[in-house]
Amino acid sequence: MLRIPSRIGSRQVLACAGRNLKCGSVMRHISRRNISKEPEKVYTNLADVNDPKRDQFFKYTWGTWLQNDKLEKDKRTTKFSLNGLNSVLDDIYRQATKNTKDNFKSETEIVPQPLTNKNRTVSMPNNIAITKLGTLNPNEKSVTIKTIASVHEGKHHRIYKVQTNLSDEKSFVLRIPYQLDDDKATISHRIRSEVATLDFLDLQLKMKVPKVICYAADDGNPLGVPFILQEYIDGSLLMKDWNPLMDDKALMVETGEGSTENPELASLNKVVKSMADFHAKLNSISFNAAGSIYFKNDSNLNSETVIDNISNDLASNLKDRWVLGPSVERRLWKKKSDLAIEERLKYLGPWKEDKETSISAQILRDTAILELKNAEARLAKSEQNGSKDKNTETLIKKQIETFQNVEKISGDLISSEMKAIPNIKDLLKPTIFHPDLDPMNVLIENKTETPFMLDLEGAVVKPFILQSSPQFVAYDGPKIYNMKSDIPEFEKLSEEERKHYEFMYKRTRNQFLWEKAVNERLPNLIMTVAPPVKVLRRPYTAVLEQKTDNDYILVDDSFFQLREAWAFFFKNGLVTKEEFPLTFTDEQVKQHADDLNSLHEKLVSTPFAATQGWVPQDMFDNLVRAGVIIKDSTGNFTVNDINPSA
């Protein structure tokens, strides 16, 4: 019998977002999350594929959506064949018994290429030597799963811990992506690129990442779903040590790390430095082109469109292992099902330097065209189907105008002609960008306290100047570096006002610590955080950061920020054209201001707008019990207006 522990829990607590939902009153109804002490256990026969006791094990449980909850949870159900997983593990073990080589330190040793198996999985021979995998007892004939535990339900995939009967009860991590996208090509590209990127980080950069044992990019394998099988690392997340809003007695960043006046900075810096070390390692090698990393022997790639000579710095025994192919940047694939995959691939790279257009300009241009083509396809589909939703069609037409402007301005923002920016040539070199560089994705191994980087999904190679700061330290609001000098009347303010300014200070402080750590490790690249550079790349980052249809307004806002600063940029050699490339009428300026205000009002007045209506399950349960969240007649949930003093 197979034992299946299922652990129910949420990984994060969200700030309240709503004019009608007061944080103070809500938080009185919410207790700090406690990880369940003991997982629920279910026993099942491995061969009994119809055992109803398994169903809960595959269902999404870490949150509830205020709208369309069942639909959202169904998309995150990760049902797979346990028997199929067992057969894959046993097949891997058979391969491992024939492989005693477990290290490839010398550049004269050829590292074996990924192996495509008859069961339509791909195994990694360099990671499955018998010395790494473990052995069976003499009286056992095959690998058997003993327990499976659901340990994490993330934004994009679910993670299971699989314990086997191999020596020392060898465990593995099984990652299964959610079927959030309408086409299989999205998941296929992401998995194939992520595995190749992890392999690159392991072999070329010598970084600590979980080794991939086996993977499948589609559902035609024994598990019946795409998956990645990795080594299991026993440890705890670095996120446990990260408290971004911790109190800071000095209320000033200048005191520095380890100061007796402000010892709290040492705690924050411990996390920041660990993340900055990974960041520096990712940027320790530059590439000859941009895109995403794949294996050269990937049969699903179009050999005519990939770039072979990806870098001049590769080890001699690894030069024929990887190529650059289509970018898997999330926004470039998200909600693009109305556009045929063949059409999408035209604008996904890879991109290489040419005499007329820099890599950066090519990426900006193609990103804009891709969004434009997708919006046009959506509009055509709506009109063809005779949709009566004229508001949506009007909105899409506004998006089309926005993306046309991004395409128009794409060649005027970032180039080697920006002489006023120090080390501009270095900033334009493509390096690896990790979109989820976050303490949540760093595991500290228990025995050695070695940090391992997890989850490289969506990683891309692109110019450093186009890379934004990690989200865990990102802050675009007003900066406060020293509460005493920047806010001299601080002590006279109300408690609510003081908390507001302290919040801005803490966000400023965290960003400052990050930029300081980057400067210490990559001083030639620090200009990427300079305010003018951020403004120049803002149209690009605003496109990538879109979460809802109305976020095109934020892309428009980047144009107006640029227009305001353009004369200054030209005077100081940051741009080459004297005239701002876009023109707007007074009516358009007024309309944008109205649209931007409406968008901000909607974000402020809509509870949990920042998470598109998703609420962590423990918070949801507490708010339901408190009468704050109520189920309506349609099956959706509404948030009650409650008394702040209650």
UniProtKB/Swiss-Prot annotation:
It is found in: Mitochondrion. Its main location: mitochondrion. SUPFAM superfamilies: Protein kinase-like (PK-like). Keywords: Mitochondrion, Transit peptide. Coiled coil: none annotated. InterPro entries: Kinase-like_dom_sf, Mito_inheritance_9. GO terms for cellular component: mitochondrion. Residues 1-34 form a transit peptide. The keyword Transit peptide applies. Gene3D superfamilies: Phosphorylase Kinase, domain 1 (3.30.200.20). The keyword DNA-binding does not apply. Belongs to the AIM9 family. This is Altered inheritance of mitochondria protein 9, mitochondrial. It comes from Candida glabrata (strain ATCC 2001 / BCRC 20586 / JCM 3761 / NBRC 0622 / NRRL Y-65 / CBS 138) (Yeast). The lineage of its organism: Eukaryota, Fungi, Dikarya, Ascomycota, Saccharomycotina.
